[in-house]
Amino acid sequence: MPKRILTGTVTSDANEQTVTVSVERRFKHPVMQKTIRKSKKYRAHDPQNSFKTGDQVRIQECAPVSKSKRWEVIVG
């Protein structure tokens, strides 16, 4: 099964080798037909500490790195 790849914005880089990435998705409400934006935060592994708050990044699923990290940053 292929690994999922998501695109989002770095919202926090305060932790060592970890960034928090906010991923936004858009969909139409099934009844109202209005476009709705929802976002979810993922903690991703950043071994070189190269990404800063506000950067657009792509993250990919990986094996668990810690209790809360299941994603790794692949592209800036």
UniProtKB/Swiss-Prot annotation:
UniProt GO BP: translation
Chain residue ranges for the region called Disordered: 34-54
SUPFAM superfamilies, alphabetized: Nucleic acid-binding proteins
Keywords noted in UniProt: Ribonucleoprotein, Ribosomal protein, RNA-binding, rRNA-binding
Stored Gene3D superfamilies: Nucleic acid-binding proteins
Described purpose of this protein according to its UniProt entry: One of the primary rRNA binding proteins, it binds specifically to the 5'-end of 16S ribosomal RNA.
Family listed: Belongs to the universal ribosomal protein uS17 family.
Subunit comment: Part of the 30S ribosomal subunit.
Protein name: Small ribosomal subunit protein uS17
Gene: rpsQ
